[in-house]
């Protein structure tokens, strides 16, 4: 049965990787393989439980006679809910942060972006919009930032070819900026939530690689742009029934929202509660502020104008379902012992985290950066560390400790490696939907640049590991 579960999940990964050909939604596939895997697991639960948790199961029985019903109760209460809780922590954090962005956007807190980007110099515009994207993505999340910046760019640049180039640069900047912090992408968030790294150490290590992964391709893309471009400053959205906030009120709301997100790592270190609790606290505070400053409006929950296309907002919901499905899928692989076997094979035949990092990047380019990150991170992220007990090399084992180099390589390669092909990230898929970009065009014009920039970042990480 373990072979069947593994086969189903591998087939699901292949279907997700070829989603642009099959037109089958990744979120649907992820939820299917995640749920079916657990259904098959619990149907043959006795063998798996006695293999992975014999002591815990016998202790839970407390002398009662074991049977199929008892083992199902044990799995549901002591195994399955543990993984559901971990997945829910990530999903709730994403829900909170994306709602924060929606509240800020509906109140015009991001209206300052378009005016500061106004210029007819194409290269200046490229650096401005990617810099803003990089900074915002590091503080919010790369998916929401990409969606917001693509909408702004689409309204300002009338030329389709230039929109395609600028859109690709936005995706690169968003993914690189998101990889810089633990709250900037689902990959870093999941690793941070699992306790394998800390926020400050993670950002310090990835600062230079992420900057180079953004600057190198952007510098090259700037050479293919004309000197000047036609620019259309989008009209400010009508907010007669939306909001009557003045500039200082919008700045206050922006400070509460963004400043609150900055405080979440500190909140986690002080309270040891899951980061999503801090995100929900920030959301509730911002919500209260929103109600206070907009108390004079009637029907304040009905907005006149939606800033983002519904197809992209629908993608945000799909992302949360995708995250849940992938985390359930990698969890069932862990419970059947697949990751433990793979870790032992890697320790004996590969024994190099750099080889794993390169493989991670290439897999992420065709699969999905979050699915790839969770897959390679789950190989060694076992609560009891059983997969490393047989490894005698202390230096090698230390790479898998808290803040070990392995976790940074997996996070960086999965996030930036997803830029090699446009289909490797949710941000890239959002760009494909909005600008109708084909994968072949992207590979010819941007994919090679993304590959080079990713390898440059890996080289920097290698240099840092040698120096430290």
Task: State where each predicted segment sits.
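Hydrophobic alpha-helical transmembrane segments
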Residues: 6, 28-32, 91, 126-131, ...
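Juxtamembrane and boundary regions of transmembrane helices in multi-pass small-molecule transporters
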Residues: 4, 23, 161-164, 168, ...
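Structural signature of hydrophobic alpha-helical transmembrane segments
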Residues: 1-8, 85-96, 138-146, 176, ...
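Cytoplasmic-side transmembrane-helix entry/capping segments in multi-pass membrane proteins
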Residues: 26-35, 116-128, 162-172, 313-317, ...
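Alpha-helical transmembrane segments of multipass membrane proteins
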Residues: 13-17, 35-39, 134-135, 219, ...
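Transmembrane helical segments that form the transport core of multi-pass membrane transport proteins
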Residues: 57-65, 85, 102, 107, ...
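Membrane-interfacial helix-loop connectors
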Residues: 37-47, 83-84, 136-173, 186-206, ...
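Hydrophobic mid-bilayer segments of alpha-helices in multi-pass membrane transport proteins
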Residues: 3-13, 23-69, 87-99, 250-260, ...
């Amino acid at each position: 049965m373990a072979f069947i579960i593994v086969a189903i999940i591998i087939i699901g990964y292949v279907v997700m990787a070829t989603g642009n050909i099959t037109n089958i939604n990744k979120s649907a596939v992820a939820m299917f393989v995640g749920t079916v895997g657990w259904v098959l697991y619990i149907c043959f639960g006795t063998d798996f439980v006695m293999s992975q948790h014999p002591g815990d199961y016998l202790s839970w029985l407390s002398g009662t006679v074991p049977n199929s019903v008892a083992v199902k109760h044990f799995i549901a209460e002591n195994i399955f809910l543990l993984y559901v809780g971990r997945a829910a922590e990530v999903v709730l954090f994403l829900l909170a942060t994306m709602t924060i962005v929606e509240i800020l956007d509906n109140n015009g807190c991001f209206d300052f972006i378009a005016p500061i980007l106004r210029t007819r110099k194409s290269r200046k515009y490229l650096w401005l919009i990617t810099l803003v994207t990089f900074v915002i993505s590091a503080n919010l999340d790369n998916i929401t930032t990409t969606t917001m910046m693509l909408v702004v760019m689409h309204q300002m640049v009338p030329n389709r070819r230039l929109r395609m180039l600028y859109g690709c640069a936005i995706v690169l900047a968003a993914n690189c900026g998101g990889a810089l912090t633990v709250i900037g992408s689902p990959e870093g968030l999941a690793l941070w939530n699992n306790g394998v790294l800390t926020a400050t150490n993670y950002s310090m290590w990835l600062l230079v690689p992420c900057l180079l992964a953004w600057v190198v391709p952007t510098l090259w893309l700037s050479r293919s742009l004309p000197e000047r471009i036609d620019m259309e400053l989008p009209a400010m959205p009508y907010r007669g029934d939306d909001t009557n906030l003045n500039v200082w009120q919008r700045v206050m709301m922006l400070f509460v929202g963004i400043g609150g997100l900055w405080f979440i790592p500190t909140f986690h270190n002080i309270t040891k509660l899951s980061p999503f609790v801090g995100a929900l606290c920030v959301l509730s505070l911002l919500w209260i502020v929103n109600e206070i400053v907009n108390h004079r409006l009637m029907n304040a929950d009905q907005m006149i104008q939606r800033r983002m296309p519904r197809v992209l907002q629908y993608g945000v919901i799909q992302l949360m379902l995708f995250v849940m499905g992938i985390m359930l899928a990698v969890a069932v692989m862990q419970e059947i012992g697949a990751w433990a076997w793979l870790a032992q094979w890697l320790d004996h035949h590969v024994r190099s985290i750099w080889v794993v990092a390169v493989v991670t990047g290439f897999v992420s380019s065709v699969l999905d950066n979050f699915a790839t990150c969770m897959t390679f991170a789950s190989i060694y992220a076992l609560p009891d560390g059983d997969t490393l007990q047989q490894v005698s090399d202390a230096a090698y084992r230390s790479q898998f400790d808290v803040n070990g180099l392995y976790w940074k390589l997996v996070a960086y390669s999965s996030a930036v490696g997803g830029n090699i092909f446009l289909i490797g990230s949710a941000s890239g898929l959002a760009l494909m939907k909005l600008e109708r970009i084909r994968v072949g065009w992207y590979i010819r014009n941007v994919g090679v640049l993304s590959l080079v920039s990713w390898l440059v970042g890996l080289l920097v990480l290698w240099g840092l590991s040698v120096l430290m």
